[in-house]
């Protein structure tokens, strides 16, 4: 199996540009024969989103992008996003293919040192 690792540098909160970049790299990977396409953690928001996570609509825009990626998927794709459950935020990874979001994995060990503030 050919696995494509798409290391992109999304601008935090620029959801339209992030969508375009993911779409472009995903299509390119498929065209080059990838059987699985992988993007970085929190690619749907950019990293680190910091206090933008608490801005009205930020999480929903991120989740709308997750739905769009899933809907337009064919070859399996794994990518990072932020999800909210009972007002608790998770740094998560989604697995999507054939137009469906098949599963989610939540990061367990969050860094809380130096420039990282994922514990908040």
Regions found by a protein language model. Give the residues of each.
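Enzyme catalytic cores with a strong preference for nitrogen-chemistry domains
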Residues: 1-120
């Amino acid at each position: 199996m050919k696995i494509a690792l798409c290391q992109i540098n999304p601008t935090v909160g620029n959801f339209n540009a992030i969508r375009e970049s993911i779409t472009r790299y995903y299509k390119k990977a498929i065209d080059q024969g990838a059987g699985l396409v992988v993007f970085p953690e929190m690619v749907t928001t950019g990293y680190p989103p910091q206090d933008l996570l608490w801005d009205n609509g930020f999480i929903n825009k991120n989740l709308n992008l997750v739905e769009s990626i899933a809907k337009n998927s064919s070859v399996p794709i794994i990518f990072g996003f932020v999800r909210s459950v009972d007002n608790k935020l998770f740094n998560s990874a989604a697995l999507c293919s054939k137009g469906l979001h098949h599963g989610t994995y939540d990061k367990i060990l969050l860094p809380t040192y130096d420039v990282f503030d994922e514990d908040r």
